[in-house]
Amino acid sequence: MPAPYKDRFAGKKVLVTGASQGIGEATALRFAEEGAQVALNGRKEDKLIAVREKLPKVSGGEHPIATGDISKEDDVKRLVAESIKAMGGLDVLVCNAGYQIPSPSEDIKLEDFEGVMAVNVTGVMLPCREVIRYWLENGIKGTIIVNSSVHQIIPKPHYLGYSASKGAVGNIVRTLALEYATRGIRVNAVAPGAIVTPINMSWIDDPEQYKAVSSHIPMKRPGESREIADAITFLAAEDSTYITGQTLYVDGGLTLYGDFENNWSS
């Protein structure tokens, strides 16, 4: 689908974490289609290079690669600094990287729980901290969008760590939005529902589960990564300058449905 606003982000500098696939890749593509220079973060350089090859060229220069583990402080300090140096600035941060490990709650391993929290919570806090520091030092009124989940408000059986992490993300967004509103820094989240992405292949590849998931979404289908990218770019654009501290649910109406446990417990 072509970008609706070709030059909406012309001259803007964007950093997207978890940009090697799925929603992160779609988001990077949408920003670039609309004129932004995009720094691509992920752990595997070859995957990021493959994504970069899909992005249109923009006037700001090449889209830089910023490898690193967003749950590691030294990595985040480096990749944020490298991104800013390569692009000559930074206007938008998209915290997209996410991780989940299914397990009955009585069997969850501590290392698995901590691993999910490290990526989904620490991996949001650290990039936000480093980017906000840069903005405050340079008087920049930037925008942060965090990729959360409908599980920010709806429990997901067998995914205790994931549900807990997304609840934490919601409060990170609200806290930062309130703390820095007077400095012109906006912070919002998108909360995808059931989306066709690599992280959801367990049910996407199972015809029966795919049918069951789709049947319990009011719009009767899972979403596409580009639809989440549409929401993210809206929250980054001038169209949303009076919106901060909010979570935009992009879920086909999934959060309107009450019998979640019986349909998502597998």
Curated annotation (Swiss-Prot):
Keywords, alphabetical: NADP, Oxidoreductase
Gene3D superfamilies to which the protein is assigned, alphabetical: NAD(P)-binding Rossmann-like Domain (3.40.50.720)
Class in the EC hierarchy, top level: oxidoreductase
Keyword Oxidoreductase: yes
Catalytic activity: D-glucose + NADP(+) = D-glucono-1,5-lactone + NADPH + H(+)
Chain sites annotated for binding NADP(+): 15-39
GO MF: glucose 1-dehydrogenase (NADP+) activity
Binding sites annotated in the UniProt record for substrate: 149
Pfam hit, one: adh_short_C2
EC number: 1.1.1.119
Active site: residue positions: 162
Transmembrane segments: none
Quaternary structure (record): Homotetramer or homooctamer.
Function: Oxidizes both D-glucose and D-mannose, but is 15 times more catalytically efficient with mannose. Strictly dependent on NADP.
PANTHER family linked: 5-KETO-D-GLUCONATE 5-REDUCTASE, ALCOHOL DEHYDROGENASE, PUTATIVE (AFU_ORTHOLOGUE AFUA_3G03445)-RELATED
Membership in a protein family: Belongs to the short-chain dehydrogenases/reductases (SDR) family.
Identification of the protein by name: Glucose 1-dehydrogenase
